Amino acid sequence: MPAFQARAAVFLSALWWGSLSGLGFVVVPLLFKYLITPAEAGAMAAKLFSAQTWLSVACTMLLLLMLNRKNVEHAQSNDEARKITAWVVVGLLLTLLVEFGVAAQIVNARASGGNLRLWHGLGSLMYLGQWICAGLTLWRLSSRK
């Protein structure tokens, strides 16, 4: 991959991982600490997680464009690109599943008295999965020569 694209890919993966880290491990816990009610914090967190979804989608789609086979020059780096691409795709799928599957179930569980703990826990695990995928992508891209 050309030098500019390689640097842009590292930048995108850093943005993806950093935004997941900042939101999930700093911003949302602070919302629950400082807002008056947990319901108010949860509503704000939901909006922020939704915005994070679209940032993640943009970063992963651009990464996938940069990692396609036409941009990879050598067979050895092609194999590495496939591994990195797999982490990006898994992260993208988790992002979309949380936004369009789990988030809706959390809203339904809150409204109907359903199993909110189950859906919140599943969403948290999937968010952690996204964070791991983004971190592995950043790690592998930043160590490429």
Q: In which residue ranges do the predicted regions lie?
A:
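Internal alpha-helical transmembrane segments of multi-pass membrane proteins, especially GPCRs
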Residues: 10, 50-53, 82, 86, ...
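Mid-bilayer segments of alpha-helical transmembrane spans in multi-pass integral membrane proteins
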Residues: 89-104, 128-131
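Interfacial loop at the N-terminal end of multi-pass membrane proteins
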Residues: 2-61, 67-73, 108-113, 117
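Cytoplasmic juxtamembrane regions at transmembrane-helix boundaries
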Residues: 71-89
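Structural signal for the C-terminal ends of transmembrane alpha-helices
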Residues: 65-72, 139-145
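Hydrophobic cores of alpha-helical transmembrane segments in multi-pass inner/ER membrane proteins
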Residues: 56-63, 126-138
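Hydrophobic alpha-helical membrane-insertion segments
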Residues: 14-17, 84-96
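Hydrophobic/aromatic residues in alpha-helical transmembrane segments
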Residues: 27, 102, 134-137
